[in-house]
A protein has these predicted regions:
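Short helix-perturbing small/polar motifs within transmembrane alpha-helices
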Residues: 1-172
Length: 172
């Protein structure tokens, strides 16, 4: 439900449609990275698809970054024949991580896209520095949302304490 609310919030922010080619390319890249992931503890899997999720959000904004993350996650989960509840959770968790963290940095003043390369528009150093720091915060929040959601669900489903799962997650 939170994923849907965040998508609706991001939808209300007027951001240009990046085009089907960009969305399909980013979704395919994230899907392929997800497929090449590695197995972790507690029947979880890690991948580098987050790079594409973050890049898509930096370039296209919170809505389209969340769409890329959601679509690539659904495709990957279905390809791996995961149960419906895992597909729903993993997809929602990625959408919340992208849209939620981007909503926070947008409220703090982050620009979309991060840099404006329009001919004739100068890059202002203070804007570049501010946006760089805000997008660094975006990445930190993305991982915080993601790790917290996974740790909570793994702790709940395994009967372990959240703190124990959280510590094991960071130790690898």
């Amino acid at each position: 439900m939170l994923a849907g609310v965040l998508l609706l919030v991001e939808w209300r922010v007027k951001v240009h449609f990046p085009g089907m080619w960009a969305l399909v390319s980013f979704t395919a890249a994230a899907f392929l990275l997800e497929r090449s992931g590695s197995n972790l503890r507690f029947e979880t899997k890690g991948s580098t698809s987050f790079v594409v999720h973050l890049a898509g959000t930096v370039l296209f904004g919170g809505l389209w970054g969340a769409v890329i993350a959601g679509c690539s996650t659904v495709l990957s989960e279905l390809d791996q024949r995961k149960s419906a509840i895992k597909v729903l959770f993993n997809t929602s968790q990625r959408i919340v991580a992208v849209a939620g963290s981007f909503a926070i940095v947008r409220l703090l003043g982050a620009a979309t896209p991060m840099f404006d390369f329009t001919p004739g528009v100068p890059l202002i150093v203070t804007d570049v520095q501010r946006n760089s720091l805000l997008y660094l915060l975006f990445a930190v929040l993305y991982f915080a949302f993601n790790t917290t959601a996974v740790s909570l669900v793994v702790a709940w489903s395994s009967g372990s304490r959240f703190r124990e799962i959280w510590n094991l997650t960071f130790r690898g």
